[in-house]
Amino acid sequence: RDVLGSRGLGDVYKRQLVACERASQALFIKQMLARPLAREIARTGEPDFCVLAAPGYQCDPAIKGLNSSAAVVINFQERVILVAGTGYSGEIKKSIFSVMNYLLPVEDDVLPMHCSASMDPVTHETAVFFGLSGTGKTTLSANPTRLLIGDDEHGWSDMGIFNIEGGCYAKCEGLDAFHEPEIFNAVRLSLIHI
């Protein structure tokens, strides 16, 4: 259930090895991370970060000074992320983006952004939509007259705006075929919702 993927574009990306306890987590993160080509894996060597997704591991709050048995722990020195005590696959994605928020500006001169983005197919003008989770970024970016760049996490560099992810992160609860037809139809193609 190990998944090797990357986040970013061209030479501006970080590779992660994600070891998952559950197959559903591996399926989720495989869709969210860009999948590197064999030649890219050979060229870049070891992953930049290792993510351990262990929903079955419960932290002892008394020993660790936590307020819950679930935890997301990031060790920048060892380049390891532990997602423990939670089966919510979104924590894997969000923990990797937290690392990208720190590393991209420092190591690659890229501004990471929690936003959606689309592009006019004729003028190539880009629209960027910022907002908290659940505020409509995905809906705004899924405009049938524009090209979707991505719906949640982007980078802004000298090359322009690019999607950090390899997939989209649409919320499925309450989707309406009339108001959000592109998103509604896209999730109907999937066999599993995580």
Language model: regions and residue ranges:
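Single conserved hydrophobic/aromatic residue that forms the stacking wall/gate
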Residues: 2-13, 193
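Extended, Lys/Arg-enriched charged tracts that mediate electrostatic binding to polyanionic substrates
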Residues: 21, 26-56
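Short Lys/Arg-enriched alpha/beta "domain-start" segment
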Residues: 16-19
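Conserved Walker
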Residues: 139
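Conserved glycine(s) of the Walker
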Residues: 136
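Charged, amphipathic alpha-helical linker segments immediately N-terminal to NTP-binding catalytic cores
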Residues: 65-103
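Glycine-rich, often acidic-flanked micro-motifs
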Residues: 114-132, 142-145, 155-192
